[in-house]
């Protein structure tokens, strides 16, 4: 199955003084944009965020 790249920008919650962007996952934990790779949740869907791109998690796992 081909990867689906998320084209819509993710809604980041906040930035710090260094310009790092943060978001909150479904468990309420914060993740920082530079802490890659990471699993993130957007509108109830699970995404794999790596090197500045977000992929649907189910499509990412099919690559392995």
Feature roles, as predicted:
Residues 1-64:
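Glycine/tyrosine- and acidic-biased, solvent-exposed loop/turn segments at the edges of beta-strands
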